[in-house]
Amino acid sequence: MIRYSLNGIRLFGSLNLFNATRILPISLGRASYAHARLFTSKVEKSGTAEESALPSVDEEEDKLNSLLGNIKVRTAQEDGVSVEEVLMHHPELLRNAPHALQQSVKEILASKEVGDAFKKN
């Protein structure tokens, strides 16, 4: 069993960010909430390297929301252009796009390159 101590309060068992943010703000009060967040951010995450390599669902959702909030994407969607087409013409947006959209755009570009090579021959 792992024992954690924060400001004189002993916490037993495994402490993760979800449990700490639910329990510590109540027990420590709002003034110490920032200290609790700093403490919980130093706890090592357990898991395989493959799990940590994939972006979380929240990160992907944030990327998608920021992408759809972009003025270029919004105006193009109003004109009936797909998000993938906008990303193909604006590589700066592609860098911050969710992984699924990046893969989709790469597949479209690869198929266009194959089609162009076929037309040349």
UniProtKB/Swiss-Prot annotation:
GO terms for cellular component: mitochondrion
Judging by the UniProt lineage, the source's domain of life is Eukaryota
Q: Keyword annotations for this protein?
A: Meiosis, Mitochondrion
Biological process terms in GO annotation:
meiotic cell cycle
The protein's location, in the record's own words, is: Mitochondrion
Mitochondrion as a keyword of this entry, yes or no, is yes
What does this chain do? Has a role in meiosis.
What is the name attached to this protein's record? Answer: Meiotically up-regulated gene 143 protein
